[in-house]
Swiss-Prot record:
Principal EC category: transferase
Species in which this protein is naturally found: Flavobacterium johnsoniae (strain ATCC 17061 / DSM 2064 / JCM 8514 / BCRC 14874 / CCUG 350202 / NBRC 14942 / NCIMB 11054 / UW101) (Cytophaga johnsonae)
GO biological process, one term: L-tryptophan biosynthetic process
Lineage: Bacteria, Pseudomonadati, Bacteroidota, Flavobacteriia, Flavobacteriales
Residues that hold anthranilate 2 according to the record: 165
Catalytic reaction(s) noted: N-(5-phospho-beta-D-ribosyl)anthranilate + diphosphate = 5-phospho-alpha-D-ribose 1-diphosphate + anthranilate
GO molecular function terms noted in the UniProt entry: anthranilate phosphoribosyltransferase activity; magnesium ion binding
HAMAP family in the cross-refs: TrpD
Function: Catalyzes the transfer of the phosphoribosyl group of 5-phosphorylribose-1-pyrophosphate (PRPP) to anthranilate to yield N-(5'-phosphoribosyl)-anthranilate (PRA).
Keywords: Amino-acid biosynthesis, Aromatic amino acid biosynthesis, Glycosyltransferase, Magnesium, Metal-binding, Transferase, Tryptophan biosynthesis
Protein name (database record): Anthranilate phosphoribosyltransferase
Cofactor field: Mg(2+)
EC number: 2.4.2.18
Gene: trpD
Cofactor binding note from Swiss-Prot or TrEMBL: Binds 2 magnesium ions per monomer.
Family classification: Belongs to the anthranilate phosphoribosyltransferase family.
Length: 330
């Protein structure tokens, strides 16, 4: 590790193989917490390269517990987090709305590190069982249209890193990796990223896979469609922008999509919205993100996806998906 750290301190970059090997060594407990912390810190002070990101990703996918859900043509709706915006759990809510619209969802998530309440925090609070048992996860998709993949159950190699990330409480390159290391290898992916540079890197890496992808970045910094301004969209076949008026809705202010100050508050906001009791801003931002997931899988237009998402939310289909998952978790 000393050699690697000296290399990084000298403003050199790692090759793909070096990046992969470092992460494998971290996972096998070869480095102490101080060394791991120093390594993570370097990448907070400069941009990660494509080779480094690719090497880290390969290591995590090699070490993870894989789950085969290929029979379902699933999508994962996942943001990198680390955008510092502290919104409510938009992508998790959008996942249930998409499931209510008939899309099969394999939601990869974790506890919040740089945010108050990550996807797993709110799912746990809602009584959702975390499991890596294939038959349970298949039953969830069969009956609820969605399963929850709690990252630590599938990436046990990262147990050495979890406490350090929590103590640092800022975004690290693991935020960038999260959406790319779904252990079920979904055929479709809706990814939100916290800056344009990362959006380009993701696009480059996904172009070399068979994944049908949509990458999102709101130009004012959100890792999802925020409706607070235009959102950059990159897919395997196009690149463009989408604005609130494209969905026929108004521009939102940042305060309208803020999350709770505690996990309890976050769960309360989640329950209100999925039950159809959210306010206009909350409903619109959830449906806009669900719309992009629906459009990614079905190839309908985002506008058509938005109508399908609204129907799922307001008819209670999204809520039914959540209730079924809660029932299966008992």
């Amino acid at each position: 590790m000393k050699t690697i750290l000296n290399k990084l301190i000298n403003h050199e970059v790692l090759s793909k193989e070096e990046a992969k090997n470092v992460l494998i060594n971290i996972s096998s407990g070869q480095y102490n917490p101080s060394q791991i912390s120093a390594f993570l810190t370097v990448f907070m002070m400069r941009s990660i390269t494509i080779d480094e990101l690719s090497g880290f990703r390969e290591a995590l996918l090699e070490l993870c517990i894989r789950i085969d859900l290929s029979a379902y043509n699933t999508i994962d709706l996942c943001g990198t987090g680390g955008d510092g915006k502290d919104t409510f759990n938009i992508s998790t809510l959008a996942s249930f709305v998409a499931a209510g619209a008939g899309i099969k969802v394999a939601k990869h998530g974790n506890y919040g590190v740089s945010s108050i309440s990550g996807s797993s925090n709110v799912m746990e609070k809602m009584g959702i069982k975390f499991s890596n048992d294939p038959s349970f996860l298949e039953k969830c998709i069969d009956q609820a249209g969605i399963c929850v993949l709690h990252a630590p159950l599938f990436h046990p190699a990262m147990k050495n890193v979890g406490p350090i990330r929590k103590e640092l409480a800022v975004k690290t390159f693991f935020n960038m990796l999260g959406p790319m290391v779904n252990p079920s290898f979904p055929q479709n992916q809706l990814v939100g990223v916290f800056n344009l540079e990362l959006a380009r890197m993701y696009a480059y890496l996904y172009q070399n896979t068979n994944v049908n992808f949509t990458i999102l970045h709101s130009l004012d910094g959100y890792d999802e469609i925020s409706l607070t301004g235009p959102t950059k969209i990159i897919t395997s076949h196009m690149e463009g922008m989408i604005k609130p008026e494209d969905f026929g809705i108004r521009l939102l202010s940042q305060t309208e999509i803020e999350g709770g100050k505690t996990i309890e508050e976050s769960a309360e906001i989640f329950t209100n919205i999925i039950s159809g009791k959210g306010n206009e801003a909350q409903n619109n931002v959830v449906c806009a993100n669900a719309a992009m997931a629906i459009a990614t899988v079905t190839k309908c237009s985002p506008q058509e996806g938005f109508e399908l998402a609204k129907e799922s939310l307001f008819s209670g289909k999204g809520l039914k998906a959540l209730q079924k998952l809660q029932e299966l978790s008992l």
